[in-house]
Design a protein with these regions (language model features):
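Conserved alpha/beta-domain cores
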Residues: 1-169
Length: 169
């Protein structure tokens, strides 16, 4: 298990303090703000910079250049754009694919019943898909939340069976 400190809107000195306490993974969802913060992290080479949230296509290049992982790829089109930028930057980036298990229209992500599209993502070069993620519905109903994560587990198991390997965590 990895703890990710979401540091958006927090100043760099707070992030430095958490790093000194042993935290090694930070999450940001604003590319421009993150790039400014990352200038102060040069003395923290072992900090993992994770992009979280919706990645707009006009921010892909800067995101690939600045981050170690992208934790919210919501479409094959965006993944292919990330792949092209990784090729340009001569790097491979870790990816989590976002699955819309709640089926809420305002949320982005691969549809849980479209396994073929999820499997196709593993053919895209320059990216290392390390897992799936979802955003459960905002509700107090624990059963609804549990159902959302159970569906994600089912998608993972079916995709791994189709791939013939346990590639998805």
């Amino acid at each position: 298990m990895e703890i990710i400190a979401v540091t958006k809107t927090w100043p760099p000195n707070y992030i430095t303090m958490t790093h000194e306490l042993g935290l090694r993974s930070i999450g940001e969802n604003r590319v421009k703000e993150a790039i400014q913060k990352f200038q102060s992290f040069k003395k923290m080479p072992n900090i993992k910079k994770r992009f979280i949230g919706h990645l707009q296509s006009n921010k892909v290049k800067k995101c690939v250049d600045a981050f170690d992982t992208i934790d919210s790829i919501h479409s094959l089109k965006t993944l292919k754009k990330v792949s092209r930028e990784c090729d340009r930057a001569k790097k491979t980036i870790e990816i989590l694919l976002q699955v819309n298990t709640s089926k809420e229209k305002q949320k982005k992500g691969f549809q849980p019943d479209n396994l073929k599209e999820i499997i196709t993502c593993f053919e895209v070069p320059n990216v290392n898909i390390v897992g799936l993620m979802t955003m459960a519905p905002y509700t107090k109903d624990k059963k609804v939340i549990k159902t959302s994560f159970s569906l994600l587990r089912d998608v993972k198991e079916k995709a791994n069976n189709m791939l013939g390997k346990n590639l998805i965590k």
